[in-house]
């Protein structure tokens, strides 16, 4: 089968002929229709320090996808051949305390599809049936293929009550932009998103952000005054991993504010903890999606009228995968879809 593999311990990714994956008794075999390129895939492509420590070589990568079930393990129940599915990319152990308590998103032994095991940049993918999610008929393949990052946005955005609240999102990558759309859809008052990438800030405006602020050109505090905000933001969503962005968030949060953090800093990050203490801030770390509450919420949000389609900006056939990675690497894109049909 065709597959995109990390063949060498250097920058790049390669289109190869790989063996079709073997299926176990509790697995599904999925014929991939569409995949999306994630920021994690770009780290692997660029072979940065994290990738060098984490990714086995050679390995098929990728973890954002939609496809069709073409074979079913003999112990599997609840799926049939022909089902259209995406899937949770975190394979959990099932036996740690959090797994046994139903908090599988907090499994301490998680294995990542396309990170620690063979991924979805291929014509076929095998995953445990437990990890598969059936896609409703009224949700397109394009949208289903980005459910993984959309789930990050939904999990982060819905961590705290948003109705009538003022929300600051730092980082206008695709996940931050989708989070802005979610916040507006569920009833936040002002949703302000910050970045220095004007292309992506314009995408955020299209997706419903109240203000998309280029912090290299405009003061966040001036924007707050313009919006009539006198007491700071109620909810903060940190999506960038950039220390200066988090410092700005701490400066502008209201007392009693709540922060959900998805962005991963490049290393240790010092902050002024007195602001956290004296403001009584709550900070929550976010990793992945709640299994599977976030997945049901994603489907429901789209079915209730949330439109995240503008975040998809580029489509390529798999043979043109290099154009897709170039688009992602340029910073002048939203989500990039690769078609395997």
Swiss-Prot record:
Pathway: Amino-acid degradation; L-threonine degradation via oxydo-reductase pathway; glycine from L-threonine: step 1/2. Its EC number is 1.1.1.103. SUPFAM superfamilies: GroES-like, NAD(P)-binding Rossmann-fold domains. GO terms for molecular function: L-threonine 3-dehydrogenase activity; zinc ion binding. Zn(2+) 2 binds at residues 93, 96, 99, 107. PROSITE patterns: ADH_ZINC. Zn(2+) 1 binds at residues 38, 63-64. NAD(+) binds at residues 175, 195, 200, 262-264, 286-287. Belongs to the zinc-containing alcohol dehydrogenase family. HAMAP family: Thr_dehydrog (MF_00627). Homotetramer. This is L-threonine 3-dehydrogenase.
């Amino acid at each position: 089968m065709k597959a995109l593999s990390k063949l060498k311990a250097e920058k790049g990714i390669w289109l190869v002929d790989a063996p079709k994956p073997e299926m176990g008794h509790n697995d599904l075999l999925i014929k991939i229709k569409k995949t999306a390129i994630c920021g994690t895939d770009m780290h692997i492509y660029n072979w940065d320090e994290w990738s060098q420590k984490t990714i086995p070589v050679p390995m098929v990568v990728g973890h954002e996808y939609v496809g069709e079930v073409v074979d079913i393990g003999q112990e599997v129940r609840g799926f049939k051949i022909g089902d259209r599915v995406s899937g949770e990319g975190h394979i959990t152990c099932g036996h740690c305390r959090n797994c046994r308590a139903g908090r599988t998103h907090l499994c301490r032994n998680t294995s990542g599809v396309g990170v620690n095991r063979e991924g979805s940049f291929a014509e076929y993918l095998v995953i445990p049936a437990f990890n598969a999610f059936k896609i409703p008929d009224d949700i397109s393949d394009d949208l289903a293929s980005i459910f993984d990052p959309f789930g990050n946005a939904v999990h982060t955005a819905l961590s705290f009550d948003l109705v009538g609240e003022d929300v600051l999102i730092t980082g206008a990558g695709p996940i931050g932009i989708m989070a802005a759309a979610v916040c507006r859809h569920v009833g936040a008052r002002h949703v302000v998103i910050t970045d220095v990438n004007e292309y992506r800030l314009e995408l955020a405006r299209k997706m419903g952000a109240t203000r998309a602020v280029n912090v290299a050109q405009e003061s966040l505090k001036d924007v707050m005054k313009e919006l009539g905000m006198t007491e700071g933001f109620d909810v903060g969503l940190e999506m960038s991993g950039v220390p200066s962005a988090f410092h700005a968030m701490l400066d502008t949060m209201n007392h009693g504010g709540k922060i959900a953090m998805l962005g991963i800093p490049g290393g240790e990050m010092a902050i002024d903890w007195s602001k956290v203490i004296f403001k009584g801030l709550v900070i929550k770390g976010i990793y992945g999606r709640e299994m599977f509450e976030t997945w049901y919420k994603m489907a429901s949000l789209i079915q209730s009228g949330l439109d995240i389609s503008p975040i998809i900006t580029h489509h390529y056939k798999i043979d043109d995968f290099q154009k897709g990675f170039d688009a992602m690497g340029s910073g002048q894109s939203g989500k990039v879809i690769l078609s395997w049909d």
